[in-house]
Structures are given as C-alpha cells and as structure tokens.
Amino acid sequence: HLEDITRADFYGFVVPFVNELMKMSAQAKIPVRIRACDTMGYGVPYPEVALPRSVPGIIYGLQHYSDVPSEMLEWHGHNDFYKAVANASTAWLYGASAVNCSLLGIGERTGNIPLEAMVMEYASLRGSLDGMDTTVITEIAEYFKKEMGYKIPPMTPFVGKNFNVTKAGIHADGLLKDEEIYNIFDTEKILNRPASVSVGKTSGLAGIAYW
C-alpha cells in the first residue's frame, strides 16, 4: 500500500522500497500486490508530466524499474481534482490490472473512484460488458436513496436523477425524431433508465409532446 505516491520521492524512495519488497516476495515465494495510492487526488493522467504526479509514469516505473507484474499492480485514487476516473482509466491503460472503487464514489473528502463509472469505462474500453448486468447500477442507486437515505447529487452520471433527462425543447424534439440523437447509448437496456424529459420553462412544444 504505497500511500501518497503522487507526492513521494519516486526514484529515491518508492523504487528502492518496492525493489526490496519484490526481493522478499521472491525469496518467500509469496506474491505481493502493490497498490499505488493517490491519497490526495494529486495525480494527473498525462505522460508528459514529471513524476511523481504522472499516473502513466508511476505505473510504467513500477513495472519497469521494480519489476512489478501487471497482474499484481493496482491503483487507488481520490477525486480532489475531479480526476479520479481519468486517473483510474489511465492506470488501466498503462498496465495496472485493477483499480479500487466504491459504490457511488463514496469515500474520504471528495470521494473515491465510483464503481459504476469504471463499469461503464470498462465497457467502453473493451467494447463488451463481458456478462455484467449493468441494470444493477440503477438498483444500487435506488437502494442507497430509499433504504439508506443517501442523497445522490442530481447531476451525477449514470445514477443521478437528471441523467438522460432533458429540459431543453430542442433536445426533446430530437428525441421525438430519433432517440439516438440525444441519448448516447441505450440507457433503457444498459441501466433500465429510458430517456425522459422534465417539463419547464425551456421545454417548448416538443418537450410537452415528448412528456
């Protein structure tokens, strides 16, 4: 558990420390999983940025300078700079086999990596759900709201009440003509959430017609 790795001395401390861990792992014949922790959400997903902030640099460095196998490398992120999902996806793409998540991103301070976001990210990257029933995401959100009294911010992607709900008349007009125009994927099939409208001062005739 490499705490606060995005503010650590990567070459002076992290690499030598992990090298010793890997030696002990080999001697004891016990696999050691290395978790790179962006404890303060300070990491960035850009390969050009200097270590220790660069997530690509961290994942690459642990694999190539400390010989950590991809299958034993995971990422743990926070969302202080709105980069939890971007950093987690980058960690995957650069070789980490796993990312730590929490339901609805609930966690310390501004939260952790939302599990539902990474499920959708996985599907986007792989082009397949690989058997996952993603309608459970909606069921989980409803459980949190009804049984636990948890208030999900309305604008939260995939689970907020405003997700795939339009208030704009021009969008409603597009939905009337072809749902694909303003619904980025089949939200009813994937999340059991059909596209809908909220009628208000910006709805126009099309919004009322769709409603």
What do the predicted segments below correspond to?
Residues 1-3, 37, 74-78, 99-104, ...:
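Generic beta-strand/beta-sheet core signal
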Residues 1-71, 89-96:
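Alpha/beta enzyme core
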Residues 6-10, 46-50, 54, 79, ...:
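Catalytic cores of large soluble enzymes that bind and process phosphate-bearing ligands
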Residues 81-86:
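Short glycine/serine/threonine-rich phosphate/pyrophosphate-binding segments
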Residues 93-114:
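Glycine-rich phosphate-binding active-site loops on the catalytic face of alpha/beta enzymes
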Residues 107-137:
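C-terminal helical cap(s) of enzyme catalytic domains, especially alpha/beta-barrels
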Residues 128-211:
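A mid-to-C-terminal "edge-of-domain" accessory segment
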